[in-house]
Amino acid sequence: MASTTNGVNGHKASQPQSLIQTLNNIGADSFSNDGERIQAVLAAYALVSRLETPWEFVARTCMGQPALGAALKVAKDLKLYDKWHELGDGEMTCEQLSELVSCDSALLFRILRHLAANHVLEETSIGVFKPTKLSISFTVPVFGEWINHLYDATTPCFFKMPEFLAQNGYKNPVDPNNGVFQAAKGWKGDMFDYYKSHPVEGASFDHVMGGVMANQAGWLEIFPHNKLLETADAQSPLVVDVGGNIGHDIERFRQEHPETASRLYLEDLPEVVKRSKCPDDVNKVGYDFFTPQPIKGARAYYMHGVLHDWSEEPARKILEMQKEAMKPGYSTLLIHDHIAPESLAHPHTTAYDLTMMVMVAGVERREAHWRALLKSAGYKLVRIWRSPLAVQGVIEAELDQ
């Protein structure tokens, strides 16, 4: 007698098709808030891992993903995303697109087909393609420059990582002047010096960092920033953004509290702060955070993504350089960074950790790691602020009296 249950785990054959249809109908607008959407993304990652066979995993990881990166880069170099966008992002045939970007149509079809197979483009019919929200986003530098950065930096570094680690006895990289980045790029000096000497790649890197800042939950969504105003001396500096790049975070604060602009300070190396987008009434200070902090007695000293660039010894020195400027019992240190869980870390956190390792010999720290680092530099951890919308958190610390 034939079985009537020939589906998934013995369920009726019609049920898997219904399940697949349900999955195909799920989109970002299926969720009431971004926290639920993020949880669904993680669940989808886990679902793929449960469904894939070993062969499907290696085919995707070892062929599909490298090929996707290359296809994205070729399309970027051809200015495909930008030129298509200028024409209104409508459906176009492969032949029309090949004329648009001056590329052999047979070659371009192979590129377009892989982009469509990975949902970067939509193939509406045979040989006809349409942009998606994702591909249109590549016309904006904070997304599009990630493709250049992939080939300028991350791919060369990860390609070199196994060889470098083997040659160095599999020791944890801690020297920002002698790591994977230097081996990959043939460079003497740290990554930041490299970008100063290579301004085109440096400008691309700035856009990448802008994308990091702009597309994660900001510190104002994580930390109760109003309490800084409620407890601040109106005549003293309010917030000092230490190593704040061109001012993405301090500008968010200024927009929320415009009356405080003259008491806000953006600090980074002189050549960086001169590119700041902040209004003139925000103070811009050229500052090397390995030297004593020049702005004294601020209510808060804020660091976003600074300390993960550095291993223990330099990170400790950066923290120590802020201490003399801080007013005991008043000044707060705010560290906005990844706080890796002891287990089951978010894949973005683990990816950041390995990226920091190969680029700058940095590290994404666990909570116990942060506590030990702060204590060694003369601070005590007051509280860790988190949000379900963010893989990063804000560590609130003060001087340990």
Curated annotation (Swiss-Prot):
Keyword Kinase: no
Domain of life, source organism: Eukaryota
The keyword DNA-binding is assigned to this record: no
Pathway linked to the protein: Secondary metabolite biosynthesis; terpenoid biosynthesis
Enzyme class: transferase
Coiled coil stretches, renumbered: none
Alphabetical UniProt keywords: Methyltransferase, S-adenosyl-L-methionine, Transferase
Residues reported in the UniProt entry to bind S-adenosyl-L-methionine: 243-244, 268
EC id: 2.1.1.-
The name this protein goes by in its record: O-methyltransferase mfmE
Source organism per UniProt: Annulohypoxylon moriforme
Gene name of this polypeptide: mfmE
